[in-house]
Amino acid sequence: MRTGVRLGIDVGKARIGIARSDPHGMLATPVETVTRDAAGTSDLARIVAIAQELDACEAVVGLPLNLRGAATPSTDDASGFAERLAARLAPLGIAVRLVDERLSTVSAQGQLRQAGKKTKQSRAIIDQAAAVVILQHALDIERASGAAPGRAAEPEPQSGRADTETDVVQGEDTQ
């Protein structure tokens, strides 16, 4: 199993839950909830800052497929977010992967209910808990298979921007 801190990311319409792993990739724990930015800049900037603060080697974004495994509008939203995040993290050497997250929020809500937390009072916590479920699932897959979980998110092309910090040369997936 690869070593290094990984981030788990649960992308929602209003909030983004963030989790992290220990450096050995054994256990996922909650970090924070970031408010979703309609312009798509401050939320990405905060996640990049968290990745740098934690010296992350990878970010795992949950891919919300329906129960049959088909894409939904939420799937497209999460994929687009992952591509934009990959464009920001690639220059830092941090890979972004997409992992099936079916029922992660339902699982997180159930765990919080068992812990005596009320759903309406725990919305921000639910997002973090869902990120923990996504990341722990990815860690377990990697531990069982020996391969990186899910699929790589390709960086979104940075068309016409002079911002060299986020310009990315697309390369092959080496994971």
Feature locations, PLM:
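Phosphate- and other anionic-substrate recognition elements at nucleic-acid/protein interfaces
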Residues: 2-7, 13-175
